[in-house]
């Protein structure tokens, strides 16, 4: 006979680290080439002029300039597009 109560096991107790997704440079901000603009999963925001897209869908600036967001109309749903306007 056991004189101590056996402790049960649980299948909980795990959680992943946050991935720090989101907008890193907002509209009107000045950025340099290579700056990360948005970290995202999937293309919720589309790349525009002077913006590149990494293999993990991260959007980054290709040139120095000012960040500009615009709303574009697509079939079924509206989308956002981010561009970098060259500062003069």
From Swiss-Prot:
PROSITE patterns per UniProt: RIBOSOMAL_L27
Region described as Disordered: 1-24
One GO CC term on file: cytosolic large ribosomal subunit
Gene3D superfamilies recorded: 2.40.50.100
UniProt keyword terms in alphabetical order: Ribonucleoprotein, Ribosomal protein
Any one GO MF annotation of this record: structural constituent of ribosome
GO biological process: translation
InterPro entries: Ribosomal_bL27, Ribosomal_bL27_CS
UniProt cross-references to NCBIfam families, sorted A to Z: L27
Family membership: Belongs to the bacterial ribosomal protein bL27 family.
Protein name as catalogued: Large ribosomal subunit protein bL27
Species: Prochlorococcus marinus (strain MIT 9313)
Origin organism lineage: Bacteria, Bacillati, Cyanobacteriota, Cyanophyceae, Synechococcales
């Amino acid at each position: 006979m056991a004189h101590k109560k056996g402790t049960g096991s649980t299948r909980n107790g795990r959680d992943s680290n946050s991935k720090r997704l989101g907008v890193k440079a907002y509209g009107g901000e000045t950025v340099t080439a290579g700056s990360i603009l948005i970290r995202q999963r999937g293309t919720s925001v589309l790349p525009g002029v002077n913006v590149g897209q990494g293999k993990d869908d991260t959007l980054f600036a290709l040139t120095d300039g000012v960040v500009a967001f615009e709303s574009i109309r697509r079939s079924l749903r509206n989308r956002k597009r981010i561009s970098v306007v060259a500062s003069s």
